[in-house]
Design a protein with these regions (language model features):
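Outer membrane beta-barrel
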Residues: 88-157, 273-274, 279-284
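Sec/Tat signal peptide C-region and signal peptidase I cleavage site
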Residues: 23-27
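Bacterial N-terminal signal peptides that target proteins for export
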Residues: 2-13
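Hydrophobic, small-residue-rich alpha-helical packing segments that form membrane-like cores
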Residues: 154, 159, 163, 167-211, ...
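Transmembrane beta-barrel wall of Gram-negative outer-membrane proteins
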Residues: 71-76, 139-153, 176-197, 220-236
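Bacterial N-terminal signal peptides
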Residues: 13-21
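Transmembrane beta-strand segments of Gram-negative outer membrane beta-barrel proteins
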Residues: 30-59, 64-66, 80-86, 110, ...
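Exposed, low-structure sequence patches enriched in small/polar residues
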Residues: 65-71, 101-103, 198, 202, ...
């Protein structure tokens, strides 16, 4: 960490602090000034790293053979009051392509007390129904004076992507700008907030035919209202509402309005927590402040959780109903029941286990479009086909520390995942519509502290049943890690083999070999290197076995 002492700046700040703090208490202000004087005027801390990767394969693959990346984060602190963090990510990924969102990013995040700014290539979230994590290039601020919270942003959401005749698959697009404001007040027993977000495409200087490609300039205004209320102790109600005004084509006057609503109630009593949630999102709900939206569904959920035996055993239950086709306009209408159970057990520091179960049933009514065309009365389609989709999953893991001493530590662990899905009509599973997936992994680790050596062995088995065929993949893995030079030099070597079988016949074999090395020197510098080789042998391959070689070199410096 770098330390700088600009005496003139220090004297000015000390004098200002003294003049501003004379009134309440002279002795108190003298102590504050003395404490302030002990602080370093300027501290610079952070890290920077550079990485290069070389890739080659036989036969050649459509993958970039050389990539490089420069990343870093730097923080400037003035008297431990004003913080100015700077982060950047520069690379040559896809150097020959144009992106609506740039892979290279440079951002600055200065903060002072309850004020914080975001400058450059950043992202912010106001709520799930307005601005939700969309990257933009511009300026954002977050203010939190007292019980108030104020956030604002303005910037370019998407960069214009022009048509390129040499790349017909390139997704062209408009330059898109967005602006947003969110305010929220947190009271002792309630909270209330509101959000407004607007975005609009700029359709000038485009290089493609709008009507031919069907890519139209869009405009959007999204409003959000949120609030929470605590009626009594441990009882909390929360509500969030979103309204999206979407214009799919700015050249037209047609505008669509969509609504979204979410409400939750939770109550804690005698170590129990009980909650009820409801959410409804209109078909077609979307905003230009998020990359993806789930819509056209209605959820009703019930949750329960409790800890037992001095928190050694935790239990969480949830269940709910979901339906879609809220407007009755789809050919398929789905109703779904979802339930899950999560259990965690930690009887001692050496043993821990967890189990998670989930199950849902989806009821689906299929209707031919001719059923609508030929319908004469509202009752004609009551006997349409009814299907039930079943899905069950199980996840379990256990970790057992067999032995722990100053000389060695032995650990045994295992994980199990199982998933089953099927389509049922009436009481019968449809032919070819049953699938099962199971994965089992075990590992044993031996850490010899005296030798700075760690050995790990494992075995994995996966079984995938679908389309009346069972595919089995299994194989062992072995890794070794050794530290030298008082743990400054770390080395590693790993080997793995797996093969895929179908009805007893071998389909593929995969060999992996990887070596790594990392060296820390002068306390703040790090140098890392790795090489990896993979070979694939396919049963029906015409050519020789496929192989690939990847090497990586990186350097890091922290200060």
């Amino acid at each position: 960490m770098l330390k700088i002492y600009p005496t003139s700046l220090q004297r000015i700040l000390l004098l200002t602090a003294l003049l501003l703090g004379m009134k309440p208490s002279y002795a108190q202000n003298i102590e504050e000034v003395l404490a302030f004087r002990k602080k370093k005027p300027l501290k610079i801390s952070g890290s920077i790293s550079a990485r290069t990767t070389l890739f080659s394969s036989q036969p050649s693959e459509a993958r970039q053979s050389f990539t490089c990346q420069l990343t870093g984060s730097v923080n400037l602190s003035l008297y431990e009051l004003l913080n100015i963090p700077l982060s950047f990510n520069l690379n040559n990924y896809g150097a020959n392509f144009s992106y609506p969102s740039l892979p290279n990013r440079l951002s600055l995040h200065p903060s002072y007390k309850w004020m914080k700014a975001h400058i450059g290539d950043v992202s912010m979230s106001f709520g799930p129904y307005t601005l939700n994590g969309h990257q933009f290039t511009g300026l954002g601020v977050e203010l939190s004076p007292g019980r108030w919270q104020v956030s604002a942003m303005a910037g370019r959401l998407l960069k214009r992507v022009d048509a390129d005749p040499n790349i017909p698959s390139l997704q062209v697009g408009y330059e898109r700008w967005g602006y947003g404001l969110k305010t929220r007040y947190e009271g002792s027993a309630f909270a209330l907030g509101g959000t407004v977000f607007a975005a609009r495409d700029r359709d000038g200087r485009i290089s493609f035919d709008i009507d031919a490609l069907g890519i139209y300039p869009k405009g959007n205004i999204a409003l959000g209202i949120e609030g929470s209320l605590s009626l009594i102790k441990d009882l909390k109600l929360s509500l969030e509402y979103g309204l999206s005004r979407m214009q799919q084509d700015l050249r037209s006057t047609e505008v669509s309005y969509y609504h979204a609503l979410r409400a939750d109630v939770s109550y804690s009593f005698l170590g129990n927590t009980l909650g009820v949630g409801y959410e409804r999102i209109d078909p077609g709900y979307a905003t230009l402040g998020a990359y993806y939206f789930n819509n056209d569904y209605e959820n009703l959920t019930l949750n329960y959780s409790r800890s037992l035996f001095d928190s050694k055993l935790s239990l969480a239950l949830s269940g709910g109903l979901q339906r879609d086709d809220l407007m009755g306009q789809k050919l398929e209408h789905n109703k779904r029941f979802v339930g899950s159970v999560q259990v965690g057990f930690t009887p001692s520091e050496a043993l821990s286990a967890s189990v998670s179960l989930s199950s849902f049933q989806s009821y689906r009514n299929l209707k031919s479009s001719f059923d609508y065309i030929n319908a004469r009365t509202p009752y004609d389609n009551l006997d349409t086909l009814q299907f039930t989709q079943l899905s069950h999953s199980l996840d379990a893991d256990i970790s057992w520390r067999l032995k722990q001493s100053e000389a060695q530590t032995q650990t045994l662990s295992a994980t199990l995942s199982y998933q089953e899905a099927a389509d049922r009509q009436g009481r019968y599973i449809q032919p070819g519509q049953l699938s099962r997936f199971m994965n089992l992994g075990t590992s044993y680790s031996l850490d010899l502290s005296v030798l700075d050596l760690t050995l790990t062995g494992g075995f994995n088995v996966s079984n995938n049943y679908a389309d009346r065929k069972a595919v089995l993949t299994l194989g062992p893995s072995l890794s070794l890690a050794k530290r030298f030079l008082k743990k400054q030099l770390s080395t590693g070597l790993s080997l793995s083999y797996n093969e895929t079988q179908e009805t007893g016949h071998r389909l593929a074999q995969v060999y992996n070999l990887r070596a790594t090395a990392g060296y820390r020197f002068w306390g703040k510098h790090g140098l890392n290197a790795s090489v990896a080789y993979q070979e694939r042998k396919l049963r029906h391959a015409v050519s020789s076995p496929r192989s690939s070689f990847t090497s990586e070199l990186s350097y890091s410096y922290s200060f």
